[in-house]
């Protein structure tokens, strides 16, 4: 089973990353001329298996494939983007395994239970005559 999904197009990016609530998506943005970073593969694999009870997915995508990632085209270092509920919540430039471990572990924690609904206001007391 592959633990990293490669994003092929904008539609997949939208469906897999931007429209998946409650899951931390870790996205490695790489350049087509050098491919995904092999140095970080073991870190991701360990996190994938150590945190398999958490809502967590790993992706890789070439910056040249998506117009929404054009700001990363030509970068020499891999970029790691962290998304939750369709919003980018963190970014790391370069291979920094301890920082990747910490951020993934912190951000992939299970979502807290929803807040209890507020109690209905008490009915006004009846006036005594």
Curated annotation (Swiss-Prot):
Pfam families per UniProt: Thioredoxin
InterPro entries assigned to the protein according to its UniProt record, in alphabetical order: Thioredoxin-like_sf, Thioredoxin_CS, Thioredoxin_domain, TXND_domain-containing
Keywords: Cell projection, Cilium, Cytoplasm, Cytoskeleton, Disulfide bond, Dynein, Electron transport, Flagellum, Microtubule, Motor protein, Redox-active center, Transport
Domain of life of the source: Eukaryota
Positions of region (Disordered): 107-129
Protein name according to UniProt: Dynein 14 kDa light chain, flagellar outer arm
Record function comment: May be involved in regulating the redox state of functionally important thiol groups within dynein.
Annotated compartments: Cell projection, Cilium, Flagellum; Cytoplasm, Cytoskeleton, Flagellum axoneme
Thioredoxin domain segment(s): 2-109
A single GO cellular-component term on record: microtubule
Low complexity: bias regions: 117-129
Cysteine disulfide partners in this protein: 34-37
UniProt subunit comment: Consists of at least 3 heavy chains (alpha, beta and gamma), 2 intermediate chains and 8 light chains.
Main localization of the protein described in the UniProt heading: other
